[in-house]
Amino acid sequence: MSKSNTYRMLVLLEDDTKINKEDEKFLKGKPGKMHEFVDELILPFNVDELDELNTWFDKFDAEICIPNEGHIKYEISSDGLIVLMLDKEIEEVVEKVKKFVEENN
C-alpha cells in the first residue's frame, strides 16, 4: 500500500483468455479470464471515512454499476484498495468511471 491512506481504485478490463497450444504447456491450469490494467484513480476520502465511502459508492452504483449490471464488479479492501473490473465489451465505460471520479472528488 502507498504511504497515503486515501482509497485508490485500480481499473481493469476483463476478457476471456485465448490460449494457443504452445502456451498451454507452460500453464498449470487454464485461466478463465485475462485482466488488463487500465488506470489507477485516487478517490476523495481516506480509509477511516466509511460514511463517505458508503455515500460515494451509493452514487457510483446508481450511475455506473446498475446500468452495466452483469458486466462490472468491484472489491473493496480495508487497506484502501478498490479493484474495479469491467468486461472488455464495455470498455467505453472506463471513461465514464474516470469522469465520475473527477466530478465527485
Swiss-Prot record:
Alphabetic keyword roster: Acetylation
Keyword Oxidoreductase among record annotations: no
Domain of life: Eukaryota
PTM sites of type N-acetylserine: 2
Residues forming coiled coils: none
The keyword Acetylation belongs to this UniProt entry's keyword annotation: yes
Any one cellular-component term (Gene Ontology): cytoplasm
Further comment: Present with 2610 molecules/cell in log phase SD medium.
Protein name from the UniProt record: Uncharacterized protein YML108W
Record organism: Saccharomyces cerevisiae (strain ATCC 204508 / S288c) (Baker's yeast)
